[in-house]
């Protein structure tokens, strides 16, 4: 009996030691759980144990860098991202992303741009590298570079809401209003009810409502805002100004603000679609074709009500009597992709 009991204790001791040691994947998995609970120091301790087993584990080194970054210990975070990059095995593109972020938050945005550019030479299909490059470029007021990077980002992942949102801000900052509005519509279609939605929706409504400036020209006539450098889209911006002014027309007096919003949106999409003809370029192919098709398929009303759902119960009330319209739009939306 004593032999059996002793053997059992020995087995339990060995088994307990094996469990405490763990394999590299097990230690990393447990470390990630701790990281997700914001227990970063404890997570790093487990990752370090994994490195004691396999010091060349790219995953363990990357997770250590990630936890140090979360702790705002940027020196150590950078140290371990460089280890991952030097190992040149796995998680290299993620390490470049993290390294660029570290450089950005530590006041080295130009170095971050170099890091992203270097990474994109090796990983030209990494969407997040393009997005981070765009974000840093935007913050440096390098708007053309941001615009170019965001176009690449959306060609890889057209459902990346943040790229649509940042592209909208980039275009509006450059006074390219029509392009910015199109990107805002797409963002709101993807994120109709998030923390960013209210500001995006407010911006969209403001951009759709303006067009004729408050100031007047020397002749006393109202002037139309917009960027004349892009004549094609500038024409569409003039039409937006006309639409904004038409709200006071006798024929529109009994219409709700939501009805006018849907009508003006549909007109905007239609005008751009009819203007396109043989025009080429990212915005014409990616956005104009997409939203013109929505107008042609009679889905604009559904889109407009869907994207305002964060404001109040307007969408839910509309849905009560228009469910078939929303279902038809939803079916179309799941099948139709952007072109570029």
What spans do the regions from the language model cover?
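Short coil turns that delineate tetratricopeptide repeat
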Residues: 55, 89-90, 124, 158, ...
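Alpha-helical segment of the N-proximal tetratricopeptide repeat
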Residues: 22-49, 53, 66, 70
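Start-of-helix register in tetratricopeptide repeats
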Residues: 25, 59, 93-94, 128, ...
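Register position in tetratricopeptide repeats
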Residues: 36-37, 70-71, 105-106, 139-140, ...
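Canonical tetratricopeptide repeat
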Residues: 63-66, 97-98, 132, 166, ...
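Alpha-helical linker/edge segments of TPR/alpha-solenoid repeat scaffolds
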Residues: 75, 105-110, 179-181, 193, ...
């Amino acid at each position: 009996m004593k032999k059996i009991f002793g053997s059992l204790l020995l087995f339990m001791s060995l088994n307990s030691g094996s469990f405490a040691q763990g394999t590299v994947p097990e230690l990393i998995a447990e470390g990630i759980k701790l990281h997700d609970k914001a227990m970063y120091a404890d997570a790093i301790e487990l990752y370090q144990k994994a490195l004691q087993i396999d010091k060349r584990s790219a995953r363990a080194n990357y997770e250590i860098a990630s936890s140090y970054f979360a702790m705002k210990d940027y020196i150590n975070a950078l140290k371990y991202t460089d280890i991952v990059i030097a190992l040149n095995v796995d998680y290299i593109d993620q390490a470049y992303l993290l390294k660029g972020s570290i450089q950005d938050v530590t006041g080295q945005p130009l170095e971050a741009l170099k890091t992203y550019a270097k990474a994109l030479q090796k990983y030209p299909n990494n969407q997040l590298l393009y997005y981070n490059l765009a974000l840093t470029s935007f913050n440096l007021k390098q708007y053309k570079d941001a615009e170019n990077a965001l176009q690449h980002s959306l060609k890889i992942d057209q459902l990346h809401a943040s790229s649509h949102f940042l592209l909208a801000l980039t275009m509006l900052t450059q006074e390219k209003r029509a392009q910015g509005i199109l990107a805002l519509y797409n963002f709101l279609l993807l994120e109709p009810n998030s923390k960013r939605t209210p500001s995006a929706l407010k911006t969209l409504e403001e951009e759709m409502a303006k067009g004729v400036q408050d100031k007047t020209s020397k002749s006393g006539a109202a002037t139309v805002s917009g960027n004349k450098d892009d004549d094609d889209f500038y024409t569409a911006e003039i039409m937006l100004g006309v639409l904004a002014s038409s709200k006071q027309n006798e024929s529109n007096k009994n219409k709700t603000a939501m009805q006018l919003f849907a009508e003006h949106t549909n007109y905007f999409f239609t005008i751009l679609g009819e203007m396109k003809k043989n025009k080429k370029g990212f915005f014409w192919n990616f956005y104009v074709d997409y939203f013109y098709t929505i107008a042609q398929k009679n889905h604009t009303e559904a889109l407009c009500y869907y994207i305002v759902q964060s404001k109040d119960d307007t969408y839910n009330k509309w849905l009560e009597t228009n469910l078939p319209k929303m279902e038809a739009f939803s079916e179309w939306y799941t099948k139709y992709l952007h072109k570029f």
